[in-house]
Amino acid sequence: MRLLRPSGDITQGAIWKHLLAFFVPLWFGTFFQQLYNTVDTLVVGRFVGKVALAAVGSTGALVNLTVGIFTGLASGAVVAIAQHYGARRWEDLRKGVHTAMLLSLLIGAFFMVAGFFLTPWALRALGTRADAFPGAELYLKIYFLGMIPNVVYNMGTGVLRAVGDFRRPLYFLIAASVCNIVLDLVLVLCFRLDVAGVAIATVCSQVLSAVLVVVSLMRSETAPYRFFPRQMRLYAEPIHSILVIGVPTALQSVMYSASNLFIQAAINSFSTDAVAAWTAYGKLDVFFWMTITAMSQSLTTFAGQNYGAGQYERLKQSVRVSTAMMAGFTLAISAAMFLLARPLVAFFCPDDDVLAIGIELVRFLVPTYITYILIELLTGAIRGAGKSLIPMVISVLGVCVLRLAWLFFVVPVHHTLLMVAASYPITWTITSAAIWIYYRFGHWLEPREKTVQKA
């Protein structure tokens, strides 16, 4: 277990040990965070029905769109705080923490109001099926009421991860996930609240996790990142850092999610069985996404602290190490999902028609996961060095624009579910090649002093 505890200075020592020490708790933390929606889907699919499952599944793209925006902005705070921590600039660190926490309140309030009132319009724009529309609208409206604690939690844990503390966020997520599971079962099985019950359970769990992380930051008495609510201000320098790094990252997330909205709209043009199968597949492929996300976030923190300390060659070495680690993880996940496709899909929805479609999706897509890992890892390293604009442009063109072109020009000619799914590996491969070219030949790894002068 000692191996999984990061040392106080990640600018020295074996790179793989530091990355693994970050990755393991972050992976489990991401697992429990994903467990919110997975448990919702499981409870609805098994105890309510496939129409309710399609309703909850139809909300996924919209939820990911909003989450992508504020997690993108949070990444700006994470990188700035990690660089200050690596360079031991404690006053800048303090200002960054208090600016980030105030921003989380403002962003959460905005999305709470906007999301609640725009939900019906957004679902209609997505072409949500009539039988799934009422449940999807109810779920989303309740979900958006919990935006403030959701954003506060993500920003607060971002602060902790930026300074290398990945264990406390894990503990908070475990507590929140247990709360979510218990409330899901109680509200659906005992009170028969169906879709509303799983949404209420999710919001209550988010409130608990937000309270835990804020209290933890306030009680970090000897730490330079201790949080004092009365010191929350919008300081100019942290705002600049957050916007320079966070806005392109947020836009990239928005474009990813927007392209997925079009994917969801295309999926909605098929049968309810197809929508339910796509939802079940989405809950399975989350195991890959939480793995690559955990490794990418670990690398961003590692890169940010080493960039702040001027350890540029060590930063580049960490990219090679993380790529080798992630390739091994990806091959193992892909093989397991391919071989166990039938029981995995049946776990979420045993309906025969849904099961057949779900198995086909799993075995078509999981072998292509390996084509995506460079996008996430190279972008994470470059972002840790304070650059996020060019990766955003590459991703928007390679993933989003090309994916939309596929949906508008290829899918209408060959209107099948697998043809829609094929948009993923095709765009991943092209974008991976483009981001590697920028990583190899672009001028992204400039010394901090030069970067500051340009700003």
What residues fall within each predicted segment?
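Transmembrane helical elements of multi-pass membrane transporters/channels
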Residues: 21-40, 142, 153, 176, ...
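Short runs within selected transmembrane alpha-helices of multi-pass transporters and secretion channels
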Residues: 74, 142-161, 169-177, 198-213, ...
